[in-house]
Protein backbone atom coordinates (compact mmCIF):
# COMPACT_ATOMS: atom_id res chain seq x y z
CA UNK A 1 0.00 0.00 0.00
CA UNK A 2 1.30 3.48 -0.79
CA UNK A 3 1.56 6.39 1.63
CA UNK A 4 -1.34 8.31 0.10
CA UNK A 5 -3.79 5.42 0.33
CA UNK A 6 -2.79 4.64 3.93
CA UNK A 7 -3.26 8.29 4.92
CA UNK A 8 -6.67 8.35 3.23
CA UNK A 9 -7.77 5.20 5.03
CA UNK A 10 -6.41 6.50 8.34
CA UNK A 11 -8.23 9.78 7.85
CA UNK A 12 -11.47 7.94 7.10
CA UNK A 13 -11.14 5.87 10.30
CA UNK A 14 -10.59 9.04 12.34
CA UNK A 15 -13.41 10.91 10.60
CA UNK A 16 -15.81 8.04 11.36
CA UNK A 17 -14.86 8.43 15.05
CA UNK A 18 -15.57 12.19 14.83
CA UNK A 19 -11.93 13.14 15.36
CA UNK A 20 -11.41 16.75 14.18
CA UNK A 21 -8.63 17.43 11.66
CA UNK A 22 -8.58 13.77 10.64
CA UNK A 23 -6.56 14.38 7.45
CA UNK A 24 -3.89 16.41 9.23
CA UNK A 25 -3.72 13.94 12.11
CA UNK A 26 -3.34 11.06 9.68
CA UNK A 27 -0.50 12.86 7.86
CA UNK A 28 1.28 13.67 11.13
CA UNK A 29 0.97 10.08 12.35
CA UNK A 30 2.33 8.81 9.02
CA UNK A 31 5.28 11.20 9.33
CA UNK A 32 5.93 9.82 12.82
CA UNK A 33 5.67 6.25 11.57
CA UNK A 34 8.23 6.59 8.79
CA UNK A 35 10.33 9.21 10.61
CA UNK A 36 9.96 11.88 7.91
CA UNK A 37 8.39 15.34 7.85
CA UNK A 38 5.02 16.22 6.30
CA UNK A 39 6.72 17.75 3.26
CA UNK A 40 8.32 14.37 2.48
CA UNK A 41 4.94 12.66 2.95
CA UNK A 42 3.25 14.99 0.48
CA UNK A 43 6.04 14.83 -2.11
CA UNK A 44 6.46 11.04 -1.92
CA UNK A 45 2.86 9.95 -1.50
CA UNK A 46 3.20 7.12 -4.02
CA UNK A 47 6.00 5.37 -2.13
CA UNK A 48 5.07 1.89 -0.95
CA UNK A 49 5.07 1.22 2.79
CA UNK A 50 6.55 -1.94 4.23
CA UNK A 51 4.28 -4.09 6.39
CA UNK A 52 5.96 -3.05 9.64
CA UNK A 53 5.41 0.66 8.94
CA UNK A 54 1.84 0.03 7.83
CA UNK A 55 1.05 -1.90 11.02
CA UNK A 56 2.68 0.78 13.19
CA UNK A 57 0.69 3.48 11.40
CA UNK A 58 -2.62 1.70 11.98
CA UNK A 59 -1.73 1.20 15.66
CA UNK A 60 -1.27 4.97 15.98
CA UNK A 61 -4.53 5.59 14.09
CA UNK A 62 -6.33 3.22 16.47
CA UNK A 63 -4.92 5.03 19.51
CA UNK A 64 -5.89 8.40 18.02
CA UNK A 65 -9.40 7.11 17.28
CA UNK A 66 -9.72 6.32 20.99
CA UNK A 67 -9.05 9.98 21.79
CA UNK A 68 -5.33 10.01 22.53
CA UNK A 69 -3.87 13.40 21.50
CA UNK A 70 -1.49 13.56 18.55
CA UNK A 71 1.10 15.32 20.74
CA UNK A 72 1.00 12.37 23.14
CA UNK A 73 1.36 9.83 20.31
CA UNK A 74 4.24 11.65 18.62
CA UNK A 75 5.95 13.16 21.68
CA UNK A 76 5.88 16.47 19.78
CA UNK A 77 3.73 19.54 20.07
CA UNK A 78 2.90 20.97 16.63
CA UNK A 79 2.46 24.73 16.45
CA UNK A 80 1.68 26.03 12.95
CA UNK A 81 4.62 24.99 10.75
CA UNK A 82 7.07 24.10 13.51
CA UNK A 83 7.12 21.92 16.56
CA UNK A 84 9.00 21.50 19.77
CA UNK A 85 9.92 18.31 21.58
CA UNK A 86 8.00 17.75 24.80
Region spans (language model):
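Conserved AdoMet
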Residues: 32-86
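Non-catalytic accessory regions of SAM-dependent methyltransferases
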Residues: 1-34, 40-42, 46-49
Amino acid sequence: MNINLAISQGSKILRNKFIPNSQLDSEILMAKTINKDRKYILLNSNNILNNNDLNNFYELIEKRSLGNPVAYLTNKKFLWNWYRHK
